């Protein structure tokens, strides 16, 4: 049974993508990719609730590949409905794997979501005011492309 079993149409107006380390760079035009550093998650809180243990010395991209594999594991998928409100951040179904998002909405019983980034607002603002208008526009386009692709 869906989390929202009221029979009402629900549109979630505050959903977030959990960006992977290279999400923005992967969505950027080639001219800007090398100028966009990967996310580093310096506080570590973002990764603490993930479905795997991250080794502080592990390459983050490799760690996220392991995390994506965990999200596809039969036992993990089988527990999604029961755990939909318990899984947070990168552990949440549909948090960073676009193909899982429709399934998460179905479990939640939501008709749609308005999706925002989680980690890039301050960076986008900094780039907007950096004086490099081409880079600011390039990163904004990468952001919008990434959000659109995810949804």
Kindly give the residue locations of the regions a language model identified:
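Helix-coil boundary/capping segments in enzymes
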Residues: 1-151
